A protein has these predicted regions:
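Short glycine-enriched loops at secondary-structure junctions
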Residues: 47-53, 72-75, 101, 113
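Divalent-metal-activated hydrolytic enzyme cores
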Residues: 1-38, 64, 73-91, 106-186
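Short beta-strand segments
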Residues: 46-48, 70, 97-101, 165-170
Length: 186
């Protein structure tokens, strides 16, 4: 019997196809009709609202397979966390990813400190003002914030129903690299 790949394995395989220019995902008209009847995404993703970051394309997934929450700097606001909880509780996603990306304008502006008070104030910055390190730090901290603020998501991990991960997409190459991954211990 063939083992079904885990959701994270499926997304990483899709990202490999995307990086290699061998995408297979298509969104045919018949698929839209199916989606009008069922909403069962494979994963939930908190990502940046940057127009260059489109999880369905980056992970080579068809319409309906990803529940995407996007906000500048992939900041886990209360509304974003509640949306992710909805995906876990009611849609049954088995994977939650916080997806940062290289060349993030929101993190860059937060580092520059030349913005109106409050704008990007929730971006987690490391003590070293290096853009690459700041992007990785912010992505990891966004996942930690979700885990700190959502008992529902934490319980879903502990019960073995959910895997959570953080990672960064390289805009130039398209490659997504996992930074942290948490799942129930077996």
């Amino acid at each position: 019997m063939t083992e079904i790949p885990s959701p994270i394995d499926q997304l990483l395989a899709g990202n490999k196809r995307y990086v290699e220019g061998k995408t297979t995902s298509s969104n045919k008209p018949g698929h839209r009709h199916e989606l009008s009847e069922v909403h069962a995404p494979l994963a939930a993703i908190l990502c940046c609202s940057d127009a260059r970051v489109v999880p369905e394309i980056v992970f080579d997934q068809p319409l309906g397979s990803l529940f995407t929450c996007s906000v500048a700097g992939n900041i886990p606001t209360t509304e974003m966390i509640e949306s992710l909880e909805y995906a876990v509780s009611f849609l049954g996603v088995q994977l939650l990813i916080v997806m940062g990306h290289t060349s993030c304008g929101a993190v860059k502006e937060a580092l520059a400190s030349e913005f109106p008070r409050g704008l990007f104030s929730h971006i987690a910055l490391p003590s070293v003002p290096n853009l690459h390190e700041a992007i990785m730090h912010n992505t990891k901290e966004s996942l930690k914030t979700i885990l700190d603020r959502s008992p529902l998501i934490l319980d879903s991990i502990e019960s073995g129903d959910l895997t959570v991960a953080s990672g960064v997409q390289d805009i130039a190459s398209g490659k997504f690299t996992v930074l942290d991954c948490y799942q129930a211990e077996e």
